[in-house]
């Protein structure tokens, strides 16, 4: 079914590819291995002329617990194929971290957003922090009725996740409240705000997603591609890209501030005790 380490790839319907994050023991937390597996799987679907729609899912029990703070078991960026144009990953201080995080978080997510085929995220259970980035990269989000969306990164002394789409997804005032409080958005509230397209019973999530994918796949491919580009470019023309570049730079400023104060890139007060030592060990590595 899959030759990837952390994701599954299949074609459940004609013209539909499904990419499933598959680290259930880690709650589908995203490490570098998963990032590059996802990229390879997205490329595979994008370059397959028979595929017209791509579905992104997460193995139960939940969609994504966000970034894996435990890292990659000793592996570094050298063990994975660099996709973008960032460089100097080994540089000291902010330079190296900026390059690494730009590659594996912001730029690669933007790359997925701009795949020239419709993409649908099927979200069940929790979708936290880095998991939001994965869902936001998709054109449509279908949520199970138990889906919960949260970005707790402010509690860790950082101004939201690296792919800072919050104002574009839920509106400016709600984005401020959501981040300031680190509250959870339920599926129905997320739908009312426009971040989620549909809410369905959990037991019917994949059936509903595949039915939607099949309906979209019946449309002309070039019309789907150009419509997606037109809508994405409309959003970009309103300043989305510039705003996200600025937010990413501020995110890195927060990391540098925390490194000076605490010796790690986040405020340890926002980390569970069980995570602090692992985070320290990962960052030292």
Features from the language model and the residues they span:
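Glycine- (often His-adjacent) and acidic-residue-rich active-site loop
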Residues: 58-107
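Terminal peptide-recognition signature
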Residues: 19, 23, 37-38, 56, ...
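Crotonase-fold acyl-CoA enzyme core
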Residues: 110-224
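Charged catalytic carboxylate motif
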Residues: 33-37, 104, 111, 208, ...
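Conserved CoA-thioester-binding segment of acyl-CoA-metabolizing enzymes
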Residues: 1-59
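C-terminal alpha-helix plus adjacent terminal tail
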Residues: 1-14, 63, 75, 81, ...
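Glycine-rich, phosphate-binding/catalytic loops in enzymes
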Residues: 35-37, 70-74, 160
């Amino acid at each position: 079914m899959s030759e990837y380490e952390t994701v599954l790839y299949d074609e459940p319907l004609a013209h539909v590819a499904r990419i499933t994050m598959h680290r259930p023991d880690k709650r589908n937390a995203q490490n570098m291995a998963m990032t590059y597996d996802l990229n390879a799987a997205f490329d595979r679907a994008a370059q397959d002329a028979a595929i017209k729609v791509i579905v992104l899912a997460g193995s139960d029990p939940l969609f994504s617990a966000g970034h894996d703070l435990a890292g990659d078991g000793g592996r570094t960026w050298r063990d994975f194929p660099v996709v973008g144009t960032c460089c100097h990953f080994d540089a000291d201080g902010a330079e190296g971290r900026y390059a690494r995080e730009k590659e594996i978080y912001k730029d690669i997510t933007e790359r997925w957003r701009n795949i020239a085929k419709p993409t649908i995220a099927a979200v069940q259970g929790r979708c936290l922090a880095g998991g939001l980035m994965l869902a936001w990269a998709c054109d449509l989000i279908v949520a199970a009725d138990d889906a919960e969306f949260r970005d707790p990164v402010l509690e860790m002394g950082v101004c939201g996740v690296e792919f800072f789409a919050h104002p574009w997804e839920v509106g400016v005032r709600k984005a401020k409240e959501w981040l300031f409080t680190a509250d959870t958005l339920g599926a129905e509230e997320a739908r009312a705000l426009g971040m989620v397209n549909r809410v369905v019973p959990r037991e019917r999530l994949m059936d509903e997603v595949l039915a939607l994918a099949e309906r979209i796949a019946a449309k002309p491919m070039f019309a789907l591609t150009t419509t997606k580009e037109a809508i994405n470019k409309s959003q970009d023309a309103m300043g989305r890209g510039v705003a996200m570049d600025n937010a990413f730079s501020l995110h890195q400023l927060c990391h540098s501030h925390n490194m000076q104060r605490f010796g790690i890139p986040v405020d340890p007060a926002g980390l569970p005790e069980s995570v602090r030592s692992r985070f320290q060990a990962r960052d030292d590595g």
